Amino acid sequence: MTTAEHLDAYLKAMGNRDVEGTKVHMADNVVLRSPIVPAPFVGKERVADVLTQLLATVDAFEPKLLLRDGADFVAVFTIRLGDHVIDGMDHMHLNDAGLVDSMTVAWRPLPSVVAVQQKLAPKLGGKAMMLVPADQSA
């Protein structure tokens, strides 16, 4: 399977909420850096658990675009949770076998990210955070 085929299949599986289908395209030592909690998630099973919890929490995950530069890819997607719409990008790196070995996630806008973080972080062992305007902080 070529690297492009791995990434296309990975994103299709995400769009179909098929976490088992994503695992075929991940290296055993994959690292996920997420906006949900500060510490990275390491290992295929742990990353798959994070994806399972994410997809169970959000209403929709919609892949939009895939950009490539060598072994580095950027996947552009939309996440929906209630009235919140998140524009997201995953920077993914592929190892020599063509498997995803690194993912760094960026989401916007911040209020929508916090809405997802509040629901998802406790499921992953993290703490829910609040977004407080500067003039209302202690």
Predicted regions and their residues:
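C-terminal and inter-domain tail/linker signature
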Residues: 1-138
